[in-house]
Structures are given as C-alpha cells and as structure tokens.
C-alpha cells in the first residue's frame, strides 16, 4: 500500500516554504502527498506554481483573534466546519502522518488528525508560538522549534532553522546576472540591501525616498514590493520582487537591513550576512519580531534598531556600529549551530513518523 502524508499550513509564504522544501523529498521516496489548505490562500497558489504532484484539498478557515470581535463568533463556526471537513478528508485518505507549518488554516487538520489517531508534526518558526500553533500544540505528537526554547514543554524538539541557503562561495554569479546594476554602483562604497514584508517594506521604501543622501554614502538595493518604485539609477536599485536574483543580490550586499521575521533572519545567518534588524513593533504584530530580534542580538548575530528610532542619524550610527564590529558578528555566525539542512531534517522527520506509527 502506498504511504500517504498530508501537509498543511498557509496564510503567509513563511507558512508554506518549508512544506515546499519537504514535499519533493517525500515524493522521491514514494509517498503520496496531499495538502489541506484554503483555495484562496497563498498555499494553493504556491502548490500550483510548484508543479509538484500534490492533491490539494480545500477547507473552511477562520482567523483566530486575541481580542473581542463579533467576527470571532462566525469564525468559530468556520473553524468547526473546517474540523469536520478535515475529519472527512483524513478518514478517507488514511495517511501515516500529517505535517503542519502553522497558520490558522492548519488548526482544523491538526485537531482532526489527533481525533483520528494520525500522528501530527508541527513546525514553529518563531521564538514564541502564535495563537494557531498554541492551539495546535495540544493536539500534536511533536512540535519542532527553530529557536532554543526556555520553556521545557514535553512535546518540543529543537531542530534549528531548516534552510537551503548557504554562505556564498564567490561573487561571480552576482557579477554575471546583475552586470547592469553593477554599472550604476560604486565599487568603493558599501552596499546596503533593504528587505521586508508588505508592511515592513513600506517603511523602508519611505525611508529611502525621504533620504536620497543615503546614496552618497552607500549603494542601495531596495526590494520594495511595489512595482511603481522600480528604478535603476546612480547608486540605487529598486525592484518590487525577486526570485532567481534573490541570492545574487544578497551576495552583493555588505549589510542587510531587514525586519524580524525568523525565516529571513536565519537565511541571513546561513549566508553569514551582516544584519541590522528593524522589527515590527507590537502595534503591527503580536511582538514576535521583537523577540526574534532580541534573540539574534543577544547571541551576537546582528544589531537592532527599533522602528520608532528610525531616523537618519540613528540609522547611520547603527550601520557604522555594525561595520566596526564586523569580525565579531561574522565569528558568532560562523560558530553558530542553529542551522539544519533540509535533508537532515527530512531524515529526522521520517524517523519520527516511523516511530510514531509503530507506537500506534
């Protein structure tokens, strides 16, 4: 009988990326792969775009809020209906395991898996669990964590960050692919790369627009998320979105100015890039980026600047500070043991699935 596994997770790219890394490995080993998500979510878009042989099953999903809202009442029914749909899907497929990367759409399948006796494995990217994973943890077999946790919860297993990204071996790729950009850049200036999510990028975009004098001291790469800003001019390259150029652009950067999302932070750690983290505050998030940034700064991987302190003088001071302590940051990143290759995590997950199914 063909082994089956169900993946779930969505809402943001960060809740899909690891699944897309793992799915080809399961397919290669002869597994039949299914995905439970939202037809209108990024998870459905990414699965279709990947071309992977994956059967997609859609369920109802609702956002779980930490504050009172009448919408919560409707969403409770949506989540309940999503659990019923997931029960039907999982009972019909009879998979050996379910793997969840989080997000609100993942809660019903994890609950359903537990009710049907199917081992459920969850991956948590942030230092503290989001609401969805806090609920899902109660129904999980194992929760893998990216960050070392102070809490000693019995089902937690620290694995570090799972990433395909590695430290660049040379700058030749960047030189070939971005020859036009390099013509506008001054090789005698340091290159800063700004990258953030949708809300985070807008703050960076405005900061760069408001301070054209930055271009006198640095080459600037701005991954903006806004095609109307696309520009290539003296000491400035603004691009809305990158895929194949992501790694070459990172190779060009001497320092990356980023938000505090864990996926990006650990990719930069893997590439050993100097980082200045400007995390989203509690007014725009649940505070997870502040926690992630604090974790990275206390371990000597990066420097932090709070968004409310983002003025040109403060920014320039922090950038100078990072470059002054460059060797310290690189030493800390080089000696870090917080990264794991996709292959090693796949082997660990496979072993845990085998162990859990034997126990059942």
From Swiss-Prot:
Family: Belongs to the glycosyltransferase 28 family. MurG subfamily.
One Pfam family cited in the UniProt record for this chain: Glyco_transf_28
Major place of residence: membrane
Reactions it catalyzes: Mur2Ac(oyl-L-Ala-gamma-D-Glu-L-Lys-D-Ala-D-Ala)-di-trans,octa-cis-undecaprenyl diphosphate + UDP-N-acetyl-alpha-D-glucosamine = beta-D-GlcNAc-(1->4)-Mur2Ac(oyl-L-Ala-gamma-D-Glu-L-Lys-D-Ala-D-Ala)-di-trans,octa-cis-undecaprenyl diphosphate + UDP + H(+)
Source organism of the structure: Streptococcus equi subsp. zooepidemicus (strain H70)
CDD domains assigned: GT28_MurG
Biological or metabolic pathway of the protein: Cell wall biogenesis; peptidoglycan biosynthesis
Membrane topology: Peripheral membrane protein
Entry protein name: UDP-N-acetylglucosamine--N-acetylmuramyl-(pentapeptide) pyrophosphoryl-undecaprenol N-acetylglucosamine transferase
SUPFAM superfamilies: UDP-Glycosyltransferase/glycogen phosphorylase (SSF53756)
EC number: 2.4.1.227
A GO MF label: undecaprenyldiphospho-muramoylpentapeptide beta-N-acetylglucosaminyltransferase activity
């Amino acid at each position: 009988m063909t082994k089956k596994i169900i993946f779930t997770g969505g809402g943001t790219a960060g809740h899909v990326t690891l699944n897309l890394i793992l799915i080809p490995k399961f397919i290669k080993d002869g597994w039949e792969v299914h995905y439970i998500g939202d037809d209108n979510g990024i998870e459905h878009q990414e699965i279709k775009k990947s071309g992977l042989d994956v059967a997609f099953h859609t369920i109802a999903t609702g956002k779980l809020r930490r504050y009172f809202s009448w919408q919560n009442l409707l969403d409770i029914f949506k989540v309940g209906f999503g659990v019923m749909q997931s029960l039907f899907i999982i009972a019909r497929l009879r998979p050996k395991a379910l793997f969840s990367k989080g997000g609100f759409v993942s809660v019903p399948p994890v609950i359903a898996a537990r009710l049907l006796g199917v081992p459920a494995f969850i991956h948590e990217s942030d230092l503290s669990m989001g609401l969805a994973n806090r609920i899902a943890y109660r129904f999980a077999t194992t929760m893998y964590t990216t960050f070392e946790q102070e809490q000693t919860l019995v089902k937690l297993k620290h694995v570090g960050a799972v990433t395909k990204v590695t430290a660049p071996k040379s700058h030749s790729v960047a030189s070939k692919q971005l020859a036009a950009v390099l013509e506008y850049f001054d090789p005698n200036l340091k290159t800063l790369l700004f990258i953030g999510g949708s809300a985070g990028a807008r703050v960076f975009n405005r900061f760069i627009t408001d301070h054209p004098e930055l271009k006198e001291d640095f080459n600037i790469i701005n991954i903006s998320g806004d095609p109307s800003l696309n520009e290539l001019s003296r000491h400035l390259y603004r691009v809305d979105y990158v895929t194949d150029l992501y790694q070459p652009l990172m190779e060009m950067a001497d320092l990356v100015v980023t938000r505090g999302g864990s996926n990006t932070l650990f990719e930069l750690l893997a590439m050993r890039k100097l980082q200045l983290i400007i995390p989203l505050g509690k007014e725009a998030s649940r505070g997870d980026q502040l926690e992630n940034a604090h974790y990275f700064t206390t371990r000597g991987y990066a420097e932090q600047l709070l968004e409310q302190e983002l003025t040109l003088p403060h920014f320039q001071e922090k950038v100078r500070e990072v470059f002054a302590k460059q060797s310290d940051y690189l030493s800390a990143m080089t000696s870090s043991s917080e990264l794991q290759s996709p292959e090693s995590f796949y082997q660990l997950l496979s072993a845990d699935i085998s162990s859990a199914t034997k126990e059942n």
